[in-house]
Amino acid sequence: HALGEANLAMDSLAEGVQRYSRFWYQLDQLYRKFTYHVRMSGQASLMGSLTEQIENLYSNNYLLKLGDRFQTFVDAASKWEAFPVRKQKEFFEHWVRPFLRKDNKVCVIISDAMRYEIGDELLRLNHSQNVPNDNEKVRQQLVVELDPVLSMLPSYTQLGMAALLPNKE
């Protein structure tokens, strides 16, 4: 089972962010889908033993261990960076401003505490669809990207959302 066998080793904060955004997020995705399907089955009581086992693995073998490993690097950091991962405060200039300079349209989905794995699911849904233009002769090409960013610290809604907007320090 993936939760018990995941190698959660990392040698730096940057490596941890990269490994999460390439591999580990899938564990969160599988867990979310499992809990969703258990609820939707209407048979939650029949799944009780399995649900308890998965909840314990997810909480103790994954979330706790991963959180402890990340915390080690957070505690040791003298400067809050994880190059090449961009900082949250660089979001607008790096991802939005280039579209605006070219007078292109851009849509940004900002959701408080949207998990990376849900962003991945949205990315996959968008890649699987073509959106027809009004005249049906031209198809609009959606460009959808998902990149991790390093959150502001302390991490709370008002500070995080403000960091995404163009402003001076």
Task: Kindly give the residue locations of the regions a language model identified.
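…; additionally, a secondary subgroup of soluble metalloenzymes is captured
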Residues: H1-V106, A113-E169
